[in-house]
């Protein structure tokens, strides 16, 4: 949070940029670790931190795609066990991250169908 505040006040400051660069490997590792452990909410927090540190980093697009795919996978699993509410949330998260993620349209159709049947 302190770094985010410093970036907002002095984004071109050399020390602020150095601090962001030092933190970046830990933030990337955080995202990978949380995705591997299937903790997608925590993974999203790591992704958000990465985006704050390096908003133009080329790796963000792939990270967004991976996170969207994980939301789809977990949402689909939970939908299969009857948790429509979580599936709706997972769909929103995936759409917000990567509207072109493979499998998103099919997942959206399954969620809509289940949601309509839930009413």
Walk through the language-model features, giving the residues of each.
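TPR repeat positional signature
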Residues: 24-30, 64, 71, 105
């Amino acid at each position: 949070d302190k770094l985010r505040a410093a970036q907002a006040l002095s984004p071109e400051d050399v020390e602020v940029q150095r601090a962001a660069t030092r933190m970046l490997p830990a933030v990337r590792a955080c995202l990978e670790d949380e995705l591997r452990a299937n903790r997608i909410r925590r993974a999203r927090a790591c992704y958000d931190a990465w985006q704050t540190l390096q908003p133009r980093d080329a790796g963000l697009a792939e990270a967004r795609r991976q996170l969207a795919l994980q939301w789809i996978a977990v949402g689909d699993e939970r939908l299969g066990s009857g948790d429509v509410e979580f599936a709706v949330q997972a769909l929103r998260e995936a759409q917000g991250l990567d509207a072109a993620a493979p499998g998103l349209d099919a997942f959206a159709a399954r969620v809509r169908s289940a949601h309509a049947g839930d009413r």
